[in-house]
């Protein structure tokens, strides 16, 4: 019934059901007096949605709370690179300065340059945006939001990435052996600093050719999969949504 409820009430309610994993997202994980919680844009939308949810138990009633869930409030302030305190959250804008590396568990780590500081960043497998992180190259300008993980004996301090917004993409240039203009075949290297030669016709070249490789990612915002959203994560459909209701009653 939750899946059906979401299909009817979306986008006035959100993050109720994960269609990709066929998973209900409104129920608590452990023993809890709260049976479920529906996130939405108004009192009317969440109360209406609750009437569509079937339960085997008789519920005592409901309460509606005004909250900052789905607002990304914790990521609105810029982090101070000269004073990155553990457990603080915010955003940074910088350029990729180390090649992304996939480590054990499928998590991806890279660093960005912000001013004169290098900040290590981690994109975790469960977010399902690790492929995006893997496709970053040196020089890409990105806007990241997340929280600072405390350094430990085995791991350095890292920004746990909660969103990745690509601002500018560098050209991905690959240097290759030149192509013979007569034979349309790749030339062979004659040795270190000796240039290239076509072994069919003898044409020579002294420099490699530049080939631009199309980028697999775009200039856009990438959010984690809905299953990895935190309570404050602002989903795509709420990016330009700003509720300004002052009256809060039923």
Question: Which residue ranges define each predicted feature?
Answer:
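Long, hydrophobic alpha/beta structural blocks
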Residues: 1-81
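Structural detector for short beta-strands of small beta-barrel domains
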Residues: 52-57, 63, 86-106, 169-181
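Short alpha-helix capping/helix-loop boundary micro-motifs
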Residues: 77-83, 126-132
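OB-fold and OB-like beta-barrel modules that bind single-stranded nucleic acids
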Residues: 89-98, 134-150, 161-164
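OB-fold (S1/OB) nucleic-acid-binding surfaces
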Residues: 101-126
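Long, charge-rich boundary regions
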Residues: 131, 137, 209-250
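OB-fold/S1-family single-stranded nucleic acid-binding modules
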Residues: 147-179
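Short cysteine-rich clusters marking metal-coordination/redox-active sites
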Residues: 180-183, 198-201
């Amino acid at each position: 019934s939750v899946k059906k409820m979401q299909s009817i009430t979306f986008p006035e309610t959100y993050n109720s059901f994960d269609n990709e994993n066929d998973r209900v997202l409104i129920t608590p994980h452990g023993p809890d007096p709260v049976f479920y919680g529906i996130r939405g844009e108004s009192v009317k939308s969440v109360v209406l949605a609750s009437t569509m949810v079937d339960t085997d138990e008789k519920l005592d009633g409901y309460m509606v709370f005004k909250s900052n869930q789905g607002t990304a409030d914790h990521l609105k302030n810029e982090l101070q690179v000269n004073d990155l305190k553990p457990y603080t959250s915010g955003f940074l804008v910088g350029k990729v300065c180390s090649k992304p590396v996939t480590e054990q568990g499928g998590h991806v780590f890279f660093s960005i340059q912000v001013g004169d500081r290098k900040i290590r960043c981690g994109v975790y497998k469960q977010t399902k945006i690790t492929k995006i992180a893997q496709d970053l190259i040196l020089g890409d300008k990105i806007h990241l939001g997340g929280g600072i993980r405390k350094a430990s004996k085995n791991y350095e301090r890292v920004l746990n990435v909660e969103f990745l917004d690509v601002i500018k993409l560098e050209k991905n240039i690959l240097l290759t052996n030149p192509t013979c203009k007569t034979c349309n075949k790749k030339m062979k290297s004659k040795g270190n600093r000796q240039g290239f030669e076509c072994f069919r016709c003898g044409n020579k070249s002294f420099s490699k050719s530049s080939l631009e490789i199309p980028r697999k990612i775009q200039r856009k915002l990438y959010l984690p999969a809905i299953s990895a959203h935190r309570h404050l994560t602002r989903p795509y459909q709420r990016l330009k949504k700003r509720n300004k209701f002052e009256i809060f009653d039923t």
